[in-house]
């Protein structure tokens, strides 16, 4: 059973050890970096993705409730567990969590446009591609393309 859990000192290493395929490494930061960034952000919400007691992925949102902004900052499933439907189940749980706030109208995310990008996954899930190119820290063009999921 797929579930989202707090990252604790007990499961931290199992989350840090998760990895994507080599040709996907330019798509998402290592989980150790994401966890560190999450700890230093006032608006980050992050969880481990587990199949029963086995760590299979990681998710992090940037939730700015006062501005009604939600960004799917990081989402990864370990290379050994991709293609099993875990990502779809976990993302459904994340969306249900975001909906529970009753203030957000959409969830935005982004992807690096390469042959092995997450665009297809997000598109199949119902995300809509926008024409906006993401600027990392509002300083430079990161080349990432924005997508959004409209909450109903």
Give the positions of each predicted feature.
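Conserved active-site alpha-helix within GNAT-family acetyltransferase domains
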Residues: 88, 114-131
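Active-site acidic-Proline motif in GNAT/NAT acetyltransferases
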Residues: 78-80, 84, 113-114
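Short glycine-rich hinge loops at helix-strand junctions in the catalytic core
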Residues: 85, 102-103, 126
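Terminal substrate-recognition subdomain of acyl/acetyltransferases
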Residues: 141-152
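Acetyl-CoA-dependent GNAT
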Residues: 2-73, 78-80, 91, 97, ...
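Conserved beta-strand-loop-alpha-helix junction that forms the acyl-donor binding cleft
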Residues: 108-119, 136-141
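Conserved beta-strand segments that form the floor/walls of ligand-binding pockets within enzyme
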Residues: 71, 76, 108-110, 146
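Conserved GNAT acetyl-CoA-binding A-motif
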Residues: 98-110
